[in-house]
């Protein structure tokens, strides 16, 4: 299993490849706000661990293993954003909150959060009931 730091890189590489068709060290560095030399070190480690294939000055390609994990990491991130919006977390806090929790939840917990999001999406009245509870709690403060 990749470390949380490795996950951040794999996720970002996956996103860049999906958006642009490629991911360069400079693009990854800019997206993650890190120095290119840090990206090079991590990319070499990810290559060694067979998440991607890296050729200096030629770029990188995710392996099937790296693509699968990248896809799952993007799903996790998007699901957590969706969940936090659903429960009423303010938009300006969502990205930071997701970044703070995403590496600490098991995949079982992620799957259960997915179930909960689906539960609320299947019947608008459930979401309205949640909003009513939140409104009552805010008035009680």
Curated annotation (Swiss-Prot):
Residues 1-63 form the HTH dtxR-type domain. Mn(2+) 2 binds at residues 11, 77, 99, 102. It comes from the Bacteria. GO terms for cellular component: cytoplasm. Mn(2+) 1 binds at residues 8, 99, 102-103. PROSITE patterns: HTH_DTXR (PS50944). DNA binding is strongly activated by Mn(2+). Transmembrane segments: none annotated. Keywords: Activator, Cytoplasm, DNA-binding, Manganese, Metal-binding, Repressor, Transcription, Transcription regulation. It is found in: Cytoplasm. The keyword Repressor applies. Signal peptide: none annotated. The keyword Cytoplasm applies. One of its GO terms (molecular function) is DNA binding. InterPro entries: DtxR_MntR_Metal-Reg, Fe_dep_repressor, Fe_dep_repressor_sf, HTH_DTXR, HTH_tscrpt_reg_MntR, Iron_dep_repressor, WH-like_DNA-bd_sf, WH_DNA-bd_sf. Its main location: cytoplasm. One of its GO terms (biological process) is intracellular manganese ion homeostasis. Homodimer. NCBIfam families: PRK03902.1. Central regulator of manganese homeostasis. Belongs to the DtxR/MntR family. This is HTH-type transcriptional regulator MntR. It comes from Geobacillus kaustophilus (strain HTA426). The lineage of its organism: Bacteria, Bacillati, Bacillota, Bacilli, Bacillales.
């Amino acid at each position: 299993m990749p470390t949380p730091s490795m996950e951040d890189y794999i996720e970002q590489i996956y996103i860049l490849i999906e958006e642009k068709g490629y991911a360069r060290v400079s693009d990854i560095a800019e997206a993650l706000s890190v120095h290119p030399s840090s990206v090079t070190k991590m990319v070499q480690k990810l290559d060694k661990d067979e998440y991607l294939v890296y050729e200096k000055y030629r770029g990188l390609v995710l392996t099937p293993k790296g693509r699968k994990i990248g896809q799952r990491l993007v799903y996790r991130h998007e699901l957590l954003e969706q969940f936090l919006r659903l429960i009423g977390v303010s938009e300006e806090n969502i990205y930071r909150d997701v970044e703070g929790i995403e590496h600490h939840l098991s995949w079982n917990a992620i799957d259960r959060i997915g179930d909960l999001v689906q539960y609320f999406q299947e019947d608008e009245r459930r979401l309205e009931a949640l909003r009513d509870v939140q409104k009552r709690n805010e008035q009680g403060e």
